[in-house]
Amino acid sequence: MKDLLRFFKIQHTQIEEFNAIKIALASPDMIRSWSFGEVKKPETINYRTFKPERDGLFCARIFGPIKDYECLCGKYKRLKHRGVVCEKCGVEVTQSKVRRERMGHIELASPTAHIWFLKSLPSRIGLLLDMPLRDIERVLYFESYVVVESGMTSLECRQVLTEEEYLDALEEFGDEFEAKMGAEAIQILLRNTNLKNECEYLREILEDSHSETKRKKITKRIKLIEAFIYSENKPEWMVLNVLPVLPPDLRPLVPLDGGRFATSDLNDLYRRVINRNNRLKRLLDLAAPEIIVRNEKRMLQEAVDALLDNGRRGRAITGSNKRPLKSLADMIKGKQGRFRQNLLGKRVDYSGRSVITVGPYLKLHQCGLPKKMALELFKPFIYGKLELQGFASTIKAAKKMVDREEAVVWDILDNVIREHPVMLNRAPTLHRLGIQAFEPVLIEGKAIQLHPLVCAAYNADFDGDQMAVHVPLTLEAQLEARALMMSTNNILSPANGEPIIVPSQDVVLGLYYMTRERSNAKGEGMVLTGPKEAECLYRLGLADLHARIKIRITEYEYDKNGEWSKKTNLVNSTIGRSILWMIVPKGLPFILVNQVLGKKAISTMLNNCYRLLGMKATVILADQIMYTGFAYAARSGASVGIDDMMIPSKKADIIDEAESEVVEIQEQFQTGLVTAGERYNKVIDIWAAANERVAQAMMDNLATETVMNRNGQLENQASFNNIFMMADSGARGSAAQIRQLAGMRGLMAKPDGSIIETPITANFREGLNVLQYFISTHGARKGLADTALKTANSGYLTRRLVDVAQDLVITQDDCDTFSGIVMSPVIEGGDVKEPLRERVLGRVLAEDILESNADTDSKVLIVRNTLLDEYWCDVLDEHSIDTVKVRSVVTCDTDFGVCSKCYGRDLARGQIVNKGEAIGVIAAQSIGEPGTQLTMRTFHIGGAASRSALESSIQIKNTGTVCLKNIKSVINGEGKLVVISRNTELKIIDQFSRTKESYKVPYGAVITKKNEEKVIHGEIVAYWDPHTMPVIAEVSGFIQFIDLIDGQSIVKQTDELTGLTSIVVLDTSERVSSAKDLRPTLKIVDINGYDIFIPGTDVPVQYFLPGRSVVQLVDGSRIICGDILARLPHESSGTKDITGGLPRVADLFEARRPKESAILAEISGTISFGKETKGKRRLMISPIEDGDVYEEMIPKWRHLNVFEGEYVDRGDIISDGPESPHDILRLRGVHAVTRYIVNEVQDVYRLQGVKINDKHIEVIVRQMLRKATVIRSGSSDFLVGEQVEYSRIKIANRKLENEGKVKISFIRNLLGITKASLATESFISAASFQETTRVLTESSVAGKRDELRGLKENVIVGRLIPAGTGYSYHQERVHHRHFSNKKETEKSVITNISSQITADEASANLTELLNATSPK
């Protein structure tokens, strides 16, 4: 019996080995071959007997028996009859699960078009027949005729005729032509299409046609027709003659109590199809009138449409409860569809979930598991052990013992759980550290205990979070859990390579308190023999924790032979630091402990420990730090009282000063000296500055206290104020929060992001009055609303990123490329935001680095292909090297995947990355995980306005030389430079010509220093008005107004008090309709009123004035070069939000073209201007060598940065604006676009203080660049203008080069991540991402093969993924397949030879062959 059962198990679990999956159209014969019988009746089951009706939708004869091994009438029961077909009811005796696999079919009485190929845009049927979709629909739904056979008449084939036209044609031509309606007609047309001829004909037209749109359309048709030819699909299969019926267990009918049934919507839809089909058959048999038959055919078409994709055409068919029925298409698409609900994510058994609490006494690799949970989760193991050890004779007995919870069960549980890791997961799992393995420790209670140090990785807290426990069952799973997922193996974060197991909050506070020093503490000045003595004195109460002492410290380090060498010194320290030294492992220097330890310092200590002493020491140290921190935090007794919030005495004065300044501005506004916008900006600036000053005063007050030392002198020491200690140590709170408690709350924002100009001057200690409280409620609500939106958006960004990068895996060691990208430090203003060492750490050099000695021959300092670790980065620093070329994922030459040299160090492990590492997914997680921390929108001054006064000058911080880049300037009346270019940079360079500072200088700034002039730190080198944007005169002369008509394009504002008039230009939206076309312009003319030209060109000097600009000149007044002609108040640009935060990151990765993007020069050459049209000017670039002149029409309101006669390089900015990544790629190349995207994304994250390694962003950029467009196809069979995978072009080019043929020339494309995911080679991956219907339609027509290269496809088909531990499994399969193919060919070779030679010769040859192929 057992053997029999085993036989059945084996029988069904055998799966075919497969390497690829193909999708294609099903031919009617194929559908019939799948089917086990035709479904003829719409009935489902008999309502009395509950047995399925014969030939109905649940028929047992077609689909199989309802009960295992039992026919429907009950004549044959049990296993012995298996395989018998009952002669009475016709049911085969077998397992009932065949009802999940066996399909049926419906023979349709009239052909029916498949709605996917008809309505899924672009319509495949329409494209193939070259008919508009509207015409095809009219034919299909029996409104018009289509000519299928034109004969000798004047009618065209595929011409659409209305009823009247058809009758006229019949009268005229009789039966010389044939026209039909319905799907029949379409099917005939499709069947009659000769694909090969059509294709050749189209290729001929393609070569002759010159219109772009026509070419595009023809190319589309060629691609579709070729797809049909190659895939051996027949076009007529897009029209169905046979409809397959889904197995009944996949569309179940479930009896509810009370005699009602719950049914899948598909049954309803099938029933409608069968009913209409049967009625149509009957009508055709009766030869009913044409009009009735036609109506029935149309209804059948609609029923089939609804079954396949309800709601795609017309109104969706609804069920009894008014909701649309779920069709086959709805079953697979969307979050609840087959792909995302059941294939990519499944519910898991052997799992449990519970609330988490703190386990402060656990070791890092442990978690506390409640006994009840453990007993339930490990049941099968316990049963097995009980039986094995003879406590229970059968499993049933064991079960009873476990249910009674006998004492022996608990002992066994202890035994089972030992060294059996479990996995803990906290939703949302944003990165791979959201699931880690721990060894369980049994505990009482019902909550899971979690080690406090892993909370940062899980982003968990103990306010009611829940976590899930999963048990790895097989030995391999346990091994992986222990070796790869154990929390002790995940010390470094994969996003940036820094420790993620870092103490926070209490622990930090405890260590900080312990390592602080206090003047005049008990025991100061003692000299001690070592840490043990220090602890002894502290425990006995003879010395204070903070007492300054001298102590003998022994430090160890490795010498050259790898032995420990020790050195002992007498060091100035404190009692607390000496006690802490006892837990620090051998090999770390005392200096790490001998300082006030804040969060950063502790992180550095752990990082150093990991790099110097490895993982084990680090884990032990982390645990010890945690225990110590908790203990001393408890001893410190730090707590917060209201008196800790000390309000500075200067606060009142500062606020009074600010208020008087605001009054002054108000008066200036009333006298008309400043506009409303300027007044608003200035008021906000005054309050922002006042807030800063109050905060500064408060921090000075809090941070230090004056005490008397033991010599009787007063000295300042860091304060022991509790709030200050918490903020200073980095345990909790920040200066901004303390500012609200003890300074002033400051400016608040309205919901639309504009700032309310009256600030809240009170703080929380003083308390807010009603008005102040009301103002501050805005911000609080907005915060909550934003958070909800943010989480959803961030999750969606992560999903798109994972989808685009999921198939990127490290597949080889070295691709031997010499290309790479150049790295230099990130400098913004006077600060180095990211030094070079942080950017290149863990990367591989692309070329040798030479020593930068000018006098000697430069010798190689670091050779190419070196992995830059901490040591080499120190070398770079010593030799003050400024730029380094490193290998990058973007430039890697591996065809499928990336090589480990181009990727560099695996950040989470600290050594070069292994083959099989899924770097794509890691990159996506690293970028997506901090997404929730990014703001949704950055206002120009965030929530509680957090910004000091606007910058209005450049004051430098280092001594050095001024270097001005991209500058165009004029000299004003005072002899100073005025900048008139828009992307000027001012850099300060030191004597080694390294950039120390770099600033953007705005248009209109006055620069006080010349280029290459020496400056010393603290000097102001440039200044400008931050509130307005000026228009600067570039020549001297007289002003002339054009189109400045009072009341139409401008309004004059006269000031009552001063009598000054200023002219304000109206925005086009504010003007009357007749004045919409006026272009208010200022022109500079000479004394006779003739045009003055820009020097060296024949362009007259004129300035178009944008709306809202203010002119304070009179027509005809004299002006001097460098004067301000008009001002544009900044408020207009201020209210436009800078897209920041998450939306900005999404825009960059989606490669969206910004509105009004910068215009770049398409070629290098000289600028000239051609004939203008009404609203645009014609810009021409003439290349210096021979070549065509490039022309472009640019709207007149765009401000140009170039003048006539100026030379520009390809990719130079002609008109300002945000740059479009597509333009950068086209004009400046892959490196530039990589640099642009990486820097822009990093700017957003850096603003939030999130560290992400550049290579993660580069990985995504590589995936965005994976397509290329063919420009010239060379000797290949690609079409011109076709978009192809870059790797396929590379492979094809290599092949062509070897054969000495013409190579393909191409340009790289930049696709947004959504587009790139949908454009992947794998249709399974694309379909499970978005637009499922479109992807599947397209792939099936093309008969695509999915090679199952990526991770997602393999998860969906249920195999190991080709990454991580599954990588070697896949490599082996490939190898095995290759080997067996080789054997096959050898076999065939041998059989061919043996027909001509003797047996002896054959055996000799065979041994020779085998010896040659056997591995040496």
Curated annotation (Swiss-Prot):
GO terms assigned for molecular function: DNA binding; DNA-directed RNA polymerase activity; magnesium ion binding; zinc ion binding
InterPro entries reported in the protein's UniProt record: DNA-dir_RpoC_beta_prime (IPR045867), DNA-dir_RpoC_beta_prime_bact (IPR012754), RNA_pol_asu (IPR000722), RNA_pol_N (IPR006592), RNA_pol_Rpb1_1 (IPR007080), RNA_pol_Rpb1_3 (IPR007066), RNA_pol_Rpb1_3_sf (IPR042102), RNA_pol_Rpb1_4 (IPR007083)
Pfam families in the record: RNA_pol_Rpb1_1 (PF04997), RNA_pol_Rpb1_2 (PF00623), RNA_pol_Rpb1_3 (PF04983), RNA_pol_Rpb1_4 (PF05000), RNA_pol_Rpb1_5 (PF04998)
Gene Ontology BP annotations: DNA-templated transcription
Catalysed reactions, as listed in the record: RNA(n) + a ribonucleoside 5'-triphosphate = RNA(n+1) + diphosphate
Any one Gene Ontology cellular component term annotated for this protein: DNA-directed RNA polymerase complex
Binding site for Mg(2+): 461, 463, 465
Binding-site positions, Zn(2+) 2: 815, 892, 899, 902
Co-factor binding details: Binds 1 Mg(2+) ion per subunit. Binds 2 Zn(2+) ions per subunit.
UniProt keyword terms in alphabetical order: DNA-directed RNA polymerase, Magnesium, Metal-binding, Nucleotidyltransferase, Transcription, Transferase, Zinc
EC number: 2.7.7.6
Cofactor dependence: Mg(2+); Zn(2+)
Binding positions (Zn(2+) 1): 71, 73, 86, 89
Function (record text): DNA-dependent RNA polymerase catalyzes the transcription of DNA into RNA using the four ribonucleoside triphosphates as substrates.
Subunit note: The RNAP catalytic core consists of 2 alpha, 1 beta, 1 beta' and 1 omega subunit. When a sigma factor is associated with the core the holoenzyme is formed, which can initiate transcription.
Family designation: Belongs to the RNA polymerase beta' chain family.
NCBIfam families xrefs: rpoC_TIGR
Protein name: DNA-directed RNA polymerase subunit beta'
Provenance organism: Blochmanniella pennsylvanica (strain BPEN)
